[in-house]
Design a protein with these regions (language model features):
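Short hydrophobic targeting helices and cationic amphipathic motifs
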Residues: 1, 6-8, 12, 16, ...
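Short, Lys/Arg-enriched N-terminal segments with co-localized hydrophobic residues
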Residues: 21-37
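N-terminal Rossmann-like or analogous alpha/beta NTP/dinucleotide-binding catalytic cores
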Residues: 39-164, 265-276, 336
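Residue-level signal for inorganic ion chemistry
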Residues: 65, 96, 136, 140, ...
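Conserved phosphate-binding loops in nucleotide/dinucleotide-binding enzymes
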Residues: 119-123, 146, 233-234, 252-263, ...
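Active-site cores that bind ATP or allylic diphosphates and position pyrophosphate for catalysis
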Residues: 143-144, 148-303, 310, 323, ...
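Small-residue-rich helix-loop
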Residues: 394-492
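Charged substrate- and nucleic-acid-binding regions of tRNA-handling and nucleotidyl-transfer enzymes
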Residues: 478-543
């Protein structure tokens, strides 16, 4: 009702003779209708098919449903749509649930979760769909079709030969096909009694406009002459996606259907099915596509790893043992992954980019979801990860590193200190150990390029003198080391660059890192002096090779 009133408002505004009070009254009516609509319990669903791993676009759909439900104090459920058993992939359903759990957006109803509208797997609801299909036939909105696969293929070939490559079973061609609209009633009854294979097809009305309002895209109008007579019920006794989807959404009291743009072409059929049953349709919202980084085409499952980044939330291993990488195993935090996905197609209307899940719930609205596709940016994704890693407590990161590296030989307190020194420079938690390996052991490799560029003839002499100063520091902490270092530079009349970088290279082997006085304090006096004594001859050998 609300979209129809909005349509009236727009028409009245364009009419110069319209009384302004009329527009005001219509707008008040819109507000009233919105209150009525939102007074109904919000129930949304994420309805993936278990045909393989869950693509990040699917995770975004689940996320937007979750945010919308939480925003409106509603219910978010998951329904597994496995009507196409030929494409069923073992393990896919478990993968989907595990991925949602890792992302922190678990539904409150679904397989294994309970709920009063179950079962939540369509193959387990098989018995309930046939009566609905038969009801449509009885109401003359659908019909039995007995055409065999061979006969349909023959029709397609004939159409191609006549210059019509895109043959469809529709309101025009159905009159020449083998179905209950063309066969005598007695023959239809006999075929059904004999158990002849058949499907039930939607009887698409001819030359009618189907109008519906999309919460993201506005009004959508499609003429039925552009639609074919889709199969609703298959010969194997299973419904197709279209029938099962409508029946399940209705019987599960779904208030809003929030799904990907790829389902927009099916929406007119779904609207007609609701009308045929005499049911109120839910609100529709079709989300924009996720695009490749260059903007050329949809980001697909086949792009996984091929473009240099994952497209799945977690690792997926095929039956043949082929691995497709996921964000979890790459080291991404779920908070960073979800934060990134939320902003792929939705704009909060403010400069804010870092959101907790609760903040996303508070800020989210379908009105700010874009109509156009959203380009995925792998570098921006790393930025979100870096930002979220820096927000983590040092103790939590250290605990995680101990869990993933059980042989790590370092105390909890020391590791926590190491994390504090390194996390500002890291993208992933594991970078702290790989990039900061010199904290745990004397380096076996050196930044030879920097050594050759920065090492002067007098540098080794300065470092030997600096070692003597280090030996004399009684309380070996960062502040005392810095004070001694500045005193040495002042005494010798040297600039900081003449000694600090060579000092770093002789202790860590690398030319950059956390503050060198902090690094020195972490390692301790004995370790620093031992390393310098061992490494200065190695550096001299590198210089001699040059």
């Amino acid at each position: 009702l609300n979209p129809h009133i909005l349509f009236l408002v727009n028409n009245q505004k364009s009419n110069p003779n319209t009384n302004p009070k009329t527009i005001i009254l219509l707008r008040l009516l819109i507000t009233f209708v919105k209150k009525i609509i939102m007074s109904k319990p919000v129930r949304v669903r994420f309805a993936p098919s278990p045909t393989g791993p869950l693509h990040m676009g699917g995770v975004r759909t689940a996320l937007y449903n979750y945010l919308f439900a939480k925003k409106h104090k509603g219910t978010f459920l998951i329904r597994i749509e496995d009507t196409d058993q030929t494409r069923f992939v073992p393990g896919a359903q478990e993968y989907i649930m595990d991925a949602l759990s890792w992302c922190g957006i678990m539904p409150s109803e679904g397989p294994g979760l309970g709920g009063e509208f179950g079962p939540y797997v369509q193959s387990e609801r098989k018995a309930m769909y046939r009566p609905y299909a038969e009801e449509l036939v009885a109401k003359e909105h659908a019909y039995y079709a007995f055409d065999t696969a061979e006969e349909l293929e023959q029709m397609r070939e004939q159409a191609k030969q006549m210059g019509m490559p895109n043959w469809q079973y529709n309101s025009v061609t159905r009159v020449s096909m083998k179905n209950s609209l063309t066969l005598p009633h007695t023959e239809v009854e006999q075929r059904l009694a004999n158990g002849d294979p058949y499907v039930i097809r939607m009887k698409m009305p001819r030359n009618e406009d189907v109008r519906f309002h999309d919460l993201i895209r506005g009004w959508v109008v499609v003429n039925t002459n552009n639609l074919d007579d889709k199969v609703l019920f298959k010969s194997d006794g299973m419904p197709t996606y279209h029938l099962a989807n409508i029946v399940d959404d209705y019987t599960m009291n779904i208030s809003h259907v929030i799904r990907g743009e790829e389902w927009l072409p099916s929406a007119p059929l779904h609207v007609l099915l609701y009308q045929a049953f005499g049911w109120d349709a839910p609100e529709f919202a079709h989300l924009p596509l996720l695009l490749r980084p260059d903007g050329n085409g949809k980001l697909s499952k086949r792009d996984g790893d091929r473009l240099g980044f994952p497209v799945f939330p977690t690792n997926w291993i095929t039956a043949e043992g082929e691995l497709y990488s996921g964000y979890r195993e790459k080291g991404y935090l779920p908070e960073a992954f979800i934060n990134m996905l939320a902003l792929l197609g939705w704009n909060p209307g403010t400069p804010q980019e870092i959101f907790t899940l609760d903040e996303l719930v508070e800020a989210f609205s379908l009105e700010r979801v874009s109509k156009s596709g959203a380009k995925f940016d792998p570098e921006k994704t790393k930025w979100f990860q870096q930002s979220w890693l820096r927000m983590q407590a040092d103790a939590d990161i250290a605990k995680g590193l101990k869990e993933t590296n059980p042989t790590l030989n370092i105390s909890d307190s020391a590791l926590e200190t190491l994390v504090g020194l390194m996390k500002e420079r890291a993208t992933f938690a594991e970078d702290i150990l790989t990039d900061g390996a010199y904290f745990l052991a004397n380096p076996s490799e050196f930044d030879t390029e920097t050594i050759r560029k920065k090492w002067k003839a007098e540098t080794s002499g300065y470092l030997n003198e600096w070692m003597d100063r280090l030996t004399g520091i009684s309380e070996f902490n960062s502040a005392n080391i810095e004070t001694a270092f500045k005193g040495y530079l002042e005494e010798k009349g040297l600039g900081i660059g003449a000694v600090l970088l060579p000092y770093r290279l002789s202790v860590t082997g690398v030319g950059a890192g956390p503050g060198m006085f902090d690094v020195s304090a972490f390692l301790g006096k004995e370790e620093v002096l031992t390393r310098m004594k061992e490494n200065l001859p190695k550096i001299a050998a590198i210089l001699n090779e040059a």
